[in-house]
Amino acid sequence: MDKTMTLFLLLSTLLLTTSLAKDLCHKDDKTTLLKIKKSLNNPYHLASWDPKTDCCSWYCLECGDATVNHRVTSLIIQDGEISGQIPPEVGDLPYLTSLIFRKLTNLTGHIQPTIAKLKNLTFLRLSWTNLTGPVPEFLSQLKNLEYIDLSFNDLSGSIPSSLSSLRKLEYLELSRNKLTGPIPESFGTFSGKVPSLFLSHNQLSGTIPKSLGNPDFYRIDLSRNKLQGDASILFGAKKTTWIVDISRNMFQFDLSKVKLAKTLNNLDMNHNGITGSIPAEWSKAYFQLLNVSYNRLCGRIPKGEYIQRFDSYSFFHNKCLCGAPLPSCK
């Protein structure tokens, strides 16, 4: 009798555990995910999304723990043969903290406005697709955003100044689009943290705002635009900047007066209209990358352990720079 009872209890526990395991997925999330799959034309990439199975076991997503009732917290669709537009149903996954559509060259249309409903979102990556239209203003409504990557798309129009109001933002990547207009003045007064800022390979124009000299950017890349003005405001001895890339613009300033942060590791300012000479203090800088070519610099290249690592490519096509690795000064 005891053995029978023990066996009964074990079987009951097993059945209960199996039942609970099957029911981890919230029914509303499963319904929404199946609508997303249908909206994307039922791609093979989402073959695991079988309505007969627990959605928390499906590929391309993650569920949270019991504290959020195992709701879907991450949707990660990338590297697949998927066509269409971002399904509006993504906005019906209220517990999402991470949303990624990446390396989907047949994904088209505008950035889905229903994303504005995702108030818990901290990580947004919509990159390497064929998305068009503007960088949406509604992103500034998502107050928990820490990471935004909209690079390698066909986005156009101006950069919304309201993005600077995101107090938790640490990373803003808008490179490789068709964005136009100036850098917003408000980017000199981010409400919270100062994010790493990547705006390269666009069609941005106008004078760089003076306010951009106020933040202590850890990484800033403004390369390959049509920007003008005095970019020396980005530098400063008291800053903690690591990477600055302002190459292939139309910046004009006197390099002789520029003081570098001791932390600066990568500096690229090739193809501008920069004048003056390379400061002697640069001989002590710890550069891993340096390029000042195609400017209007003159004078002797300072001698130093790290600056001497670079070949002529980093210095050539200037007005009258001289000294190793270029020809000797006369």
Swiss-Prot record:
It is a peripheral membrane protein. Disulfide bonds join 25-55, 56-63, 298-320, 322-329. GO terms for cellular component: extracellular region; membrane; plant-type cell wall; plasmodesma. LRR repeats lie at residues 69-93, 94-117, 118-141, 142-166, 167-192, 194-215, 217-237, 238-260, 261-285, 287-308. SUPFAM superfamilies: L domain-like. Inhibitor of fungal polygalacturonase. It is an important factor for plant resistance to phytopathogenic fungi. Glycans are attached at residues 106, 120, 130, 291. The keyword Disulfide bond applies. Residues 1-21 form the signal peptide. Keywords: Cell wall, Disulfide bond, Glycoprotein, Leucine-rich repeat, Membrane, Repeat, Secreted, Signal. One of its GO terms (molecular function) is polygalacturonase inhibitor activity. Belongs to the polygalacturonase-inhibiting protein family. This is Polygalacturonase inhibitor 2. The gene is PGIP2. The keyword Transcription regulation does not apply. It is found in: Secreted, Cell wall; Membrane. Its main location: secreted. PANTHER family: POLYGALACTURONASE INHIBITOR 1 (PTHR48059), POLYGALACTURONASE INHIBITOR 1-RELATED (PTHR48059:SF4).
